[in-house]
């Protein structure tokens, strides 16, 4: 599993408001994101908190927020699915995509993925190496996340370029990933500037 913290979101640069990116995050989640304490919040609340917290002390040409994406391999997705099946196995039931799970299993699967999100964000907070400033875990960082289980082909995919798939179609198989938006400023007393870019491709 790899984390790729985007310096600049494809949905707009991160020098200004996070609204456009956060609305993109909420498009398939009923407009709800989970926060650093395990609660669900609206898209409006999320981007307003990020924007308000990120004001002041940052130059106009510097990032105010970041958008890490945690992407899982198909084998990792199948492993998580095998942990939550209510009956049978992924092999006996021929589980190959998220849509092969029943409603209860989909809920349990997403819960497991959210648990991993908190683990990954805890590790990121530790890797800032600012424990002396009060940054110890994910609760010391202002962030919001959403789990997505589908990916679409884009014009940049080789399958589209080679005319083996159409742009906009769903990709087959498990495609679970976690979108995160997080403030450049931590939640410690000094609101220290933090950046995941030092570990732009860190294996977790």
Where are the regions that the model predicts?
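N-terminal nicking endonuclease/strand-transfer module with a His-rich metal-binding environment
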Residues: 1-204
């Amino acid at each position: 599993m790899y984390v790729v913290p985007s310096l600049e979101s494809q949905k707009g640069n991160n020098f200004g408001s996070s609204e456009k990116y956060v609305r993109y995050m909420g498009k398939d989640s009923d407009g709800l994101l989970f926060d650093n304490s395990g609660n669900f919040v609206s898209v409006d609340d999320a981007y307003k908190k990020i924007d308000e917290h990120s004001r002041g002390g940052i130059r106009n040409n510097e990032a105010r927020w970041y958008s890490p994406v945690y992407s899982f391999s198909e084998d990792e997705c199948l492993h998580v699915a095998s942990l939550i099946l209510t009956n049978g196995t992924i092999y006996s039931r021929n589980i190959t995509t998220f849509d092969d799970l029943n409603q209860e299993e989909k809920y349990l699967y997403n819960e497991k993925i959210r648990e991993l999100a908190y683990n990954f964000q805890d590790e990121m907070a530790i890797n800032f190496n600012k424990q002396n400033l009060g940054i110890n875990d994910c609760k010391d960082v202002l962030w919001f996340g959403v789990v997505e289980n589908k990916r679409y082909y884009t014009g940049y995919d080789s399958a589209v370029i080679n005319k083996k798939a159409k742009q906009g179609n769903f990709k087959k198989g498990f495609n679970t990933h976690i979108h995160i938006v997080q403030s450049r400023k931590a939640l410690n007393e000094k609101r220290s500037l933090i950046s995941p870019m030092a570990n732009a491709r860190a294996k977790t």
